[in-house]
């Protein structure tokens, strides 16, 4: 059944806006903010520059919109893990899995995060920075729950957050390098994320447990 012309016209602005966002994510991830040109975005999205400026105001406005939207969805996903009904050990395992799943499902996000880190966060507005600050309190809540349950010892939430986030960011972002190393026959680095997730779960739990040699199932 053909969509009525009036309905198609209502959908067109939404579709164009979503296409601009998709193209912009790919370009910002591949080139960074400074090297991305509005002309390129408009050409690849098949819109004129005026429409892009109409929706987002400027290249910086578009970039901030994407970053804020991505961080907001990321933090919401991690908040779900922290607030779920589960033991602290289960939550730590799920936290690692959620990090890996989210950064794999949204491959432009780790690249944009690493580029922004290299730029000193110069393009992050106050609202986005505030949203980023929720990760450490969430990690702290997992540690404190484990301490109340008698299974975790003392641990620094900032260090744990950087260890888990940094490791996962690096693993997901360097997939093309691992693939090329395999193709050249220099080594056989893993391409699948499941073994990485499993190992990072065990490392995290072992570092947190009062008795690191006392194994618990994390399935």
Positions of predicted regions on the chain:
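C-terminal peripheral helix-coil segments that are non-catalytic and often amphipathic
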Residues: 1-4, 101, 105, 133-149, ...
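Basic, helix-initiating cap at the start of DNA-binding domains
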Residues: 1-31, 35-46, 60-64, 72-73
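Short coil/turn segments at alpha/beta junctions that flank glycine-rich nucleotide-binding fingerprints
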Residues: 30-34, 85, 106, 149
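Short hydrophobic/aromatic patch on the recognition helix
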Residues: 45-56
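Amphipathic alpha-helical linker/stalk segments
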Residues: 66-94, 124, 142
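Hydrophobic alpha-helical connector segments
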Residues: 79-111, 157-164, 194-197, 219
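Amphipathic alpha-helical segments used for helix-helix packing
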Residues: 104-126, 174-183
């Amino acid at each position: 059944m053909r969509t009525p012309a009036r309905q198609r016209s209502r959908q067109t602005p939404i579709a164009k806006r979503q296409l601009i966002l998709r193209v912009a994510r790919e370009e910002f991830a591949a080139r960074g903010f400074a090297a991305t040109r509005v002309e390129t975005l408009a050409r690849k999205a098949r819109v004129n520059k005026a429409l892009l400026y109409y929706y987002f105001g400027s290249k910086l406005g578009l970039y901030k919109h994407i970053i804020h939207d991505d961080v907001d969805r990321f933090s919401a996903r991690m908040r779900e893990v922290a607030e779920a009904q589960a033991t602290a050990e289960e939550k730590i395992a799920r936290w690692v899995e959620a990090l890996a799943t989210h950064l794999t499902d949204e491959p432009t996000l780790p690249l944009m995060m690493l580029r922004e880190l290299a730029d000193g966060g110069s393009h992050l507005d106050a609202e986005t920075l505030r949203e980023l600050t929720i990760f450490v309190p969430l990690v702290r809540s997992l540690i404190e729950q484990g301490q109340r349950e008698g299974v975790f010892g003392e641990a620094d939430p900032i260090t744990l957050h950087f260890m888990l986030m940094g490791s996962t960011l690096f693993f997901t972002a360097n997939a093309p390098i691992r693939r090329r190393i395999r193709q050249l026959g220099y080594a056989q680095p893993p391409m699948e994320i499941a073994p990485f997730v499993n190992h990072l779960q065990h490392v995290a739990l072992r570092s947190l447990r009062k008795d690191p040699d006392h194994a618990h199932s994390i399935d």
